[in-house]
């Protein structure tokens, strides 16, 4: 069963990583933690994604002006192509809905990352037309 656990002193150094050909598209675990700290005043929430008790990925979102920014998300190379990304992203979206502060989620993916693009489309995101130096903007309404 997929679950999210807030990053804490016991789970922040788990060695999670993506394939070498994916590194251009996603931040590594240390950078996600640094970003969570940098955005702490915007209520950043960083999670380790678990399949039962096995850590399989990481995610981060935080508040911006009028939306949640689903900033970082990856599944470890050993657990990809098993549907975990879709399940975990749905849990993140539910957390945002439960929080209830905003109705909108924004994110971006790096141009060329077809796996991310397809995942986000499947989750109901649509393109905004924003392109910030190869980062393609998407958004989704929660309610």
List where the protein language model places each region.
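Conserved active-site tyrosine of GNAT-family acetyltransferases
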Residues: 120, 125
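Conserved GNAT acetyl-CoA-binding A-motif
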Residues: 96-108
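Terminal substrate-recognition subdomain of acyl/acetyltransferases
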Residues: 136-143
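Conserved beta-strand-loop-alpha-helix junction that forms the acyl-donor binding cleft
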Residues: 106-117, 133-135
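Acetyl-CoA-dependent GNAT
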Residues: 2-71, 76-78, 89, 95, ...
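Conserved glycine-rich acetyl-CoA-binding loop
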Residues: 76-90, 99, 111-118
């Amino acid at each position: 069963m997929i679950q999210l656990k807030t990053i804490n002193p016991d789970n922040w150094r788990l060695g999670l990583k993506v394939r070498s050909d994916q590194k251009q598209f996603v931040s590594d675990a240390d950078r996600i933690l640094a970003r969570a700290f940098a955005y702490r005043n915007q209520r950043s929430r960083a999670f380790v994604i678990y399949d039962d008790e096995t850590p399989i990925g990481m995610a981060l979102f935080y508040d911006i002006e009028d939306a949640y920014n689903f900033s970082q998300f990856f599944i470890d190379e050993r657990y990809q192509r098993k549907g975990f990304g879709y399940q975990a992203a749905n849990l993140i979206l539910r957390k945002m809905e439960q929080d209830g502060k905003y109705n909108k989620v924004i994110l971006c993916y790096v141009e060329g990352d077809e796996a991310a693009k397809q995942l986000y489309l499947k989750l109901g995101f649509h393109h905004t037309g924003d392109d910030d130096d190869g980062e393609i903007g998407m958004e989704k309404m929660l309610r």
